[in-house]
From Swiss-Prot:
Cross-referenced PROSITE patterns: RIBOSOMAL_L17 (PS01167)
PANTHER family registered for this protein in UniProt: LARGE RIBOSOMAL SUBUNIT PROTEIN BL17M, RIBOSOMAL PROTEIN L17
Name assigned to this protein: Large ribosomal subunit protein bL17
Oligomeric and partner information: Part of the 50S ribosomal subunit. Contacts protein L32.
UniProt family annotation: Belongs to the bacterial ribosomal protein bL17 family.
Lineage, opening ranks: Bacteria, Bacillati, Mycoplasmatota, Mycoplasmoidales, Mycoplasmoidaceae
GO molecular function: structural constituent of ribosome
Protein keywords: Ribonucleoprotein, Ribosomal protein
Keyword Glycoprotein: no
Any one Gene Ontology cellular component term annotated for this protein: cytosolic large ribosomal subunit
Listed HAMAP family: Ribosomal_bL17
Biological-process GO terms, alphabetical: translation
Organism: Malacoplasma penetrans (strain HF-2) (Mycoplasma penetrans)
Length: 119
């Protein structure tokens, strides 16, 4: 993610953007974002769903450390959704829980947009 490594973009900013987007994907099943952010967020969403498939206390705590409150769900609701609904949905699937659909370029700054959604 070359745009993140520029001056003024700190590590804490990068991690917070990823945490926010992971939480939004879990809450809404899809988000619209830039292509580079979608590619980076995809790794973390797949990782957190793999944690949910283990369903141990340690995996719940690891997921709780990543997820944040969203506008429609609290952190506890997201953890509940992750460890009940999504865990059952992806038990027979080994990876590849998300897909990226390209939307084209945004009018204002000509950056490529994409939809990151759960399969």
């Amino acid at each position: 993610m070359s745009y993140i490594n520029k001056k003024g973009k700190t590590t804490s900013w990068r991690l917070m953007v990823i945490r926010q987007q992971v939480s939004e994907v879990i809450a809404n099943n899809q988000i619209t974002t830039t292509l580079t952010k979608a590619k980076e967020t995809r790794k973390h969403v797949d990782r957190i769903i793999t944690l949910a498939k283990k369903n141990t206390l340690a995996s719940r705590r690891a997921a709780a450390a990543i997820l944040l409150d969203t506008s429609i769900s609290t952190k506890d609701q997201l953890i509940q959704k992750l460890f009940t609904d999504l865990q059952k949905k992806y038990t027979s699937r080994n990876g590849g829980y998300t897909r990226i659909l390209k939307l084209g370029r945004r009018k204002g700054d000509n950056v490529e947009e994409a939809i990151l959604q759960l399969v």
